[in-house]
Amino acid sequence: MREELIQGLLDFLNASPTPFHATTSLAMRLEAAGYRHLDERAPWHTEAGGRYYVTRNDSSIIAFKLGKRPVVEGGIRLVGAHTDSPCLRVKPSPELQRQGYFQLGVEVYGGALLAPWFDRDLSLAGRVTYRRDGKVESQLIDFYQPIAVIPNLAIHLNREANMGWAINAQNELPPILAQLASSETADFRALLAEQLAMEHDFNPDAVLDYELSFYDTQSAAIVGLNQDFIASARLDNLLSCYAGLQALIDSSDEETCVLVCTDHEEVGSCSACGADGPFLEQVLRRVLPEGDDFVRSIQRSLLVSADNAHGVHPNYADKHDGNHGPKLNAGPVIKINSNQRYATNSETAGFFRHLCLENEVPVQSFVVRSDMACGSTIGPITASQLGVRTVDIGLPTFAMHSIRELAGSHDVDHLVKVLTAFYSSPELP
């Protein structure tokens, strides 16, 4: 069972180089589990016992199953995560021809660790919008193969490279795609048209626009002498998306359960498909009772905001509070912050800790050092948007926001187990 779960995660990570592909991957798995797609632009006809999902912008997804018990009595069990990760995105007019090389100008998306992007075999994926037979359409593309690299400057030409060299994103990050003859001119949109023809078997009249990200082609892997770790891009936060999906599929059908995986968390969530937008509330208002009963249902509900936590690094242990250093493979972490950077309170933390104890899942706590700034999640955003009680949790991770992150392989079981118990729980606090 564990091997199957881990292999499923690796396959999901490899199939999801962008939020668009992650949403497609989640939708495919939901379809296989009997969930039916709902179109936001069409009327909905849902019923108790039904399983449904809806997407927005091709990059956010909400899946839910309507339980047998009325939500005004039992509330809703929600798990939230996000589909996006820090990366390098191609600019609208990206072509650069410098010293005979074809390069693409890129913009840094989110708070990326930039140094690990150098000397990697990079590919390109995302969504392309084009004109075809007089209509505007969109498709996902993925080059799959290594097509670009950002070479480092040799240490002989940069003797201070190992002493804290600052990276200039404008000048130093454009990847090299090809070497051009003096008579050649780079045309990125023509390249995209060729890729559309190869992947989807048609020739567009014109490529109009795109949202494309570079990604590392190295596959997700189990590493360590005892296979203790998962190394992959985008563990933050596709790991939580996958765990939430598995828990939703594995849980009982008695209660109403929701999985929400939104885009744009890494840049503030303020978008039509982000957690700071109306997506979740609009979906809930279409399937829950109206008026007073809607508020009653929300107030009986609980959200588990699942997003990776900072594991205590053996080489940098002083970056953590001495009493709050989460270890990899020691269970999910309850995140707490007095300034509401996390939405956890004593009641929601206590309930999650209770679930872990009841299901023999180890559990840890995280509080940022008092002299350091604290990050945040979709937890406080969703709590303030919806008025739902929330606990912020996540699995301990090294190298968060690097091109390749590290998490504990045993923690995947821990998280799926406790989230399944949460979805199946007959009582909420």
From Swiss-Prot:
Gene3D superfamilies: Aminopeptidase i, Domain 2, Zn peptidases. GO terms for molecular function: aminopeptidase activity; metallopeptidase activity; zinc ion binding. Its cofactor is Zn(2+). GO terms for biological process: proteolysis. It comes from the Bacteria. Zn(2+) binds at H82, H156, H401. The keyword Zinc applies. GO terms for cellular component: cytoplasm. Keywords: Aminopeptidase, Hydrolase, Metal-binding, Metalloprotease, Protease, Zinc. Belongs to the peptidase M18 family. This is Probable M18 family aminopeptidase 2. The lineage of its organism: Bacteria, Pseudomonadati, Pseudomonadota, Gammaproteobacteria, Pseudomonadales. The gene is apeB.
